[in-house]
């Protein structure tokens, strides 16, 4: 039962997918940016038996919001409960649960939110945002769980680490994506807007949030346009989420992490198996798609880093 001043909304969806598979997908919070459309980035802060604490950045009503949550995971009852520890206005408190109720006809997924608002006038907007994001999350979860292939074949992560003359200079090169059309031969045009995060934990308060639209030239001479949200922490990291992934993917996110003289480029992708043959040709498999993505995305990151290293000049 909700406490005084607290409100409850419940979203449900039935699926033929097994309950345990659905539970395990929700439990893997690191994969959320590649699976759930609203989620931009997740940083795990603590993890212990049956509990974890993480910071999340997500798009809510077209803006990027951040909060810190603690979760309890029960693999026996297939239940995940959560509670926000650090909220942002207009939310005063937020918690809830994921439940997966299997029966002979499939599984009912139940996503519950209990929340209170700083100002009651904000309630309609909060309900609208919860309805929109919860609907997207349930649809994406069920779509992935109902695939014939195991989720671990479709969602995977890979990374490359390269040495550079200066990690700080490499950060400056990659952060200034508005100059890429002058610096990278495959980039035709970049449109960039940015704003300071301004809120959240002290260690990320100097973060900037970038909205980047980029037009690139493909190997066959055509053009391809992508749009990404990027979270930039000076000299440390740039994480990103593609809002409209390429045709082969249902989700794509990644990160650039900078050391003193190294940069690591990481990609997490979710393959759309229904598009594999359309993109790669008749008879192509998910395994072929994994190889293709590893080669193409990895090559793009390495090429960007080589240009960044060249711009920085030789190591002193």
UniProtKB/Swiss-Prot annotation:
It comes from the Bacteria. GO terms for biological process: antibiotic biosynthetic process. Keywords: Antibiotic biosynthesis. CDD domains: OtcD1_ARO-CYC_like. Pfam families: Polyketide_cyc. Signal peptide: none annotated. Pathway: Antibiotic biosynthesis; actinorhodin biosynthesis. Is needed for correct cyclization of the oligoketide leading to isochromanequinone formation. This is Actinorhodin polyketide synthase bifunctional cyclase/dehydratase.
